Structures are given as structure tokens and as C-alpha cells.
Amino acid sequence: ISSDTNTYNAAASGASGISSSSVKLEASGLSCSADLDAIFNEAASKYGVDAKFLKAIAKCESDFSTECTSRSGAMGIMQLMPQTAASLGVTNAYDPYQNIMGGARYISEKLTQYNGDKSLALAAYNAGSGNVAKYGGIPPFKETQNYVAKVMAYYNS
């Protein structure tokens, strides 16, 4: 993370090396502050998505950093793109509550769209539903393939 701009270089492997001072990482890599944990649990309950799955996405997207912005403009802990954030009613993508709730709603919609298939939902979260439709599954983009594998590895750990 660049301390002056709070940006990071979005890599195929996610946002490795980024951490927030409030994050406590343990063996599974999905442990976060109690405040964030409470938000993940509320979002999981509200949108019917496993809290561990939401945390796996956040771990891969931002390493639980609430203030980061990717090269492509994705913002906050769940790395919402501005247009997606707006469509989800997120007015401040750096607010952890709004961002996690928006990300949970979005992945819930993708899970519904793909009949509960987590890999396809993740591919759509990362590369867009249009690309999933175009390629009839996970797109042949290294970034997306690595992203799906990494999130699922965190989730299954």
C-alpha cells in the first residue's frame, strides 16, 4: 500500500502484502477484527451467504484493508467498482459496513444467478457476468482463474 494514496497494484494473486492495523491474521488467514467480524456475520445473515465465504473474498480482494483502491478503481474491503457500488446503494465504499453489505448483496445475487455455484459466482464477481456467459464458465483469464482458486482455497482452509 502506498501511504500517500492508499492504492495498491492489483495482481492476479489478489492484494497480498496489504494489511490493516486492525487485522489479526491467524492460521486460517481469515481472522479479522471483532468489528469487521460482526459486520461479516450480519451481512451473512441478511444475504444468506456463508460468513467464511465473505471473509475469503475480502481476504483475497484487500487482505481486510478498508481503505485500499485498486488500479482499476475498485474500492474498500470487498473491492467494489464505483458503478457496482452505486447500483448496490453504497454511498461510501470505504465505509466497512456499507462495503461489506454491498459486497455480500452482490455475491448473493451472483450465487443466485449461478444456482449456488461458488466458482462461477466468484468468476462473475471478478470478471463480470458477461464474461462468464461469453465463455460458458470461468473465463480463460489468468487473473480470474487465480482469483477463483485463491478465494476457494481460503474458504476451504
Predicted regions and their residues:
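Solvent-exposed, acidic/flexible segments
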Residues: 29-37, 46-47, 51, 70-78, ...
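Short, solvent-exposed positions on alpha-helices
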Residues: 52-55, 119-123
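A cross-kingdom feature marking charged/low-complexity
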Residues: 45, 153-157
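Export/targeting segments at the very N-terminus of extracytoplasmic proteins
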Residues: 4-64, 83, 97, 104
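Substrate-binding/active-site groove segments that recognize
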Residues: 60, 67-90, 99-111, 123, ...
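Amphipathic alpha-helical polymerization modules
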Residues: 38, 42, 94, 105, ...
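Flexible, glycine-rich active-site loops centered on histidine and acidic residues
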Residues: 132-138
